[in-house]
Structure formats: structure tokens, C-alpha cells
Amino acid sequence: MNAKEFLIELLKFKSVTPNDDGALNFIAMELSDFEAFFIEKEGIKNLLLTKKFKDEGEHLAFGGHVDVVPAGEGWSSDAFVPMEKESFIYARGAQDMKSGVAAFVDALKNADFKGARLSLILTSDEEGEAIYGTKAVLEWMQKRDMLPDYAVVAEPTCVKKIGDSIKIGRRGSINGKLLIRGKQGHVAYPEKCINPVHDFAPVLKLLAGFDLDPGSAEFSPSKIVVTDIRGGIEVCNVTPNDLKLMFNVRNSPDTSLEDVKSYVEKICHGLNYELELKQSSEAFLTNIDNKIVQKMNESVQKITHEVPELNTKGGTSDARYFAKYGVKVVEFGVCNDRIHAIDERVSIEEFEKLCLVFKDLIENF
């Protein structure tokens, strides 16, 4: 089957995280000349497809996920019955990221590779906790001395048109929970209470929206963003016993969890508080002079006639795991205007160009 036919079939699998619904088997059969390893951990299914061309040379891998978020209500048609309409294909996962997976498969089938090894790493747990997916496969590969030198993840990176953006890194994510302790009491006797809201009010302006670093050419500043704040028992005559606040920092490599901890401790000095911090993902950056960045940039410009912005914008992705294992990684895919949305769709023209970009990358790597 051709690339579009394969994509349409792939979109029919109801592969809501963490269930692959048979999609991984379907892909393995399409690339039957690749060696297949089904790697399962804690009930999460993953697939490594790999093909050796020669003993010496570079190992190029492609990474992605077949799982999708739930469709929800309000779709114009069944989210798992792909509908082609006005040059678009509508279905859950059309942009995020089954179009990328299908483009990988098409390129791996048809491109002439001059390196040592090609691999495709797929998981059914990227939209969930993402602990036992790509990370588990890379761990498995490391133990067998099979880690790739370079990788491409086909997350939908483009904004307005195919070719306008390549991700060369990602910010990390630090989650924070702050508890300010007080003493509950009658509102008419504030002198007998310790009101944590009053105590924390001057501190809030030092926390909310604060930039922990000035940013750089590649990264925006690491900003503290308050996501939730609450205290009291929803009555007007009782002061709160405590104040709970949650925040997130999308951090660049210039700001660490320890930096966040030090700053919060400094501004909360004198308060009775508890602080909990967790790094849910780490920042990474692939140098713009690295081969994978240069070659991807060349292929994108050649096929799309666009000059892509090399950036680190957006949330986290499984590309961070490749970086953690020392693999030089970039991300490139279709536009992301309908990801996780009702009536998710992908432009057929964008998809066809994506197939050509990946094919060109393989052949000129």
C-alpha cells in the first residue's frame, strides 16, 4: 500500500494510551525486512525495528508513538474512522502523531541508506506517564550496545506551514507544591490567628511570573508560573489554617531544580512552609552545528522551500530520552494546529512532503 493508504489504516486503530490496539504489529508487518523486537515493560508495549546495512558507519533512528489521547465528544464523524475531506484526513492522531509514524515507515521502505543501521523506535505510552515507553527501549538498546548516533522524532512541530519549524531541544519541566502553615481562627479576632494568606501575600508578587534566568538565543527565560492557589474552607468568618500553592517552571539548562529551591527558600524566609519539587523532564539542546540539525535543515528546505526556525518552544516530548542517552536528536513533523482537539486533521499535502523530507534525509545522511 502507498503512504496515504498506510496512514489511513493506521488511523483506524483505537490506540488510546496505553493500548496500541494492534498498531505495532501492523507496522512491524509493513517493515517485514526489518528485525523486530517487541519490548514490554510494566504492561506497556513498545517496538524496535532495526536493519543493519554494514558493519562500520552511523546509526540513524526514528522515534515516535502510536498512542493517542481520547477523542471525547463533539466530533463531526467517528474519530477512529478516518474521513478524507477537502485535502485533509480527519481522525484522532492525524497530526499527533500517526502521520509522522506513517512518514517514517514510507521513508524506511523506499530510501537508499548509505550508513550502517536504520532503526524505528515506537511506543504506546507517550501521551501517558511516558515512563515505560521510549525510555525503556533505549535502556534495552544500551545494554546491547545498539544505541543510535542520531535520531529524529516526528512530533508535529510546524506552526503555520510544513517546514517552518524544527525543534533542536526542549525545556525541562519542574513542578512545585508550596504549603504555607498558619493557625485557623475567628475572623473577628485576627490577633489570635496566624493567617497564611496575609503572611504569603507579599511573597506572591516575588514568585508569580518571576524569571529565574534571562534566557538565551535558544531558550526563553525559566519562568515561575503559578497554576493553583487555595486556602480556607469557603466561608467568610474563619481564617485559613494553611495556604496551598502549585507552580511549574519550564526550565532551560541554565536553571536547575536546586536553583528553584534556593530562590523559593529565600523569598519564603521567616514563613512556616513546606516545599516539594519534582523534575518531571530535563532540558536538552542539540547544537545547531551537529550533523543531524544540519542535514534535517537541508532536507526541509529542499523539499518544502521554507527556511525553518530552529527552536526549543513548546512542551516536553520523548526526544528528551534520546538526549539523556547521548543521542543527538531533532524533532520535525506536520503542523500542530489541531493536536488533541476535536476534528483533528492533517493536510495530505503536508503529509506527502513529510514523507519526502524523511526520505531525503536518509538518502543524504
UniProtKB/Swiss-Prot annotation:
Matching PROSITE patterns: ARGE_DAPE_CPG2_1 (PS00758), ARGE_DAPE_CPG2_2 (PS00759)
CDD domains listed in its UniProt record: M20_DapE_proteobac
GO biological process, alphabetically ordered: diaminopimelate biosynthetic process; L-arginine biosynthetic process; lysine biosynthetic process via diaminopimelate
UniProt keyword annotation of RNA-binding present: no
Signal peptide: none
Cofactor binding description: Binds 2 Zn(2+) or Co(2+) ions per subunit.
Job of this protein: Catalyzes the hydrolysis of N-succinyl-L,L-diaminopimelic acid (SDAP), forming succinate and LL-2,6-diaminopimelate (DAP), an intermediate involved in the bacterial biosynthesis of lysine and meso-diaminopimelic acid, an essential component of bacterial cell walls.
Family classification: Belongs to the peptidase M20A family. DapE subfamily.
Record's protein name: Succinyl-diaminopimelate desuccinylase
Originating species: Campylobacter jejuni subsp. doylei (strain ATCC BAA-1458 / RM4099 / 269.97)
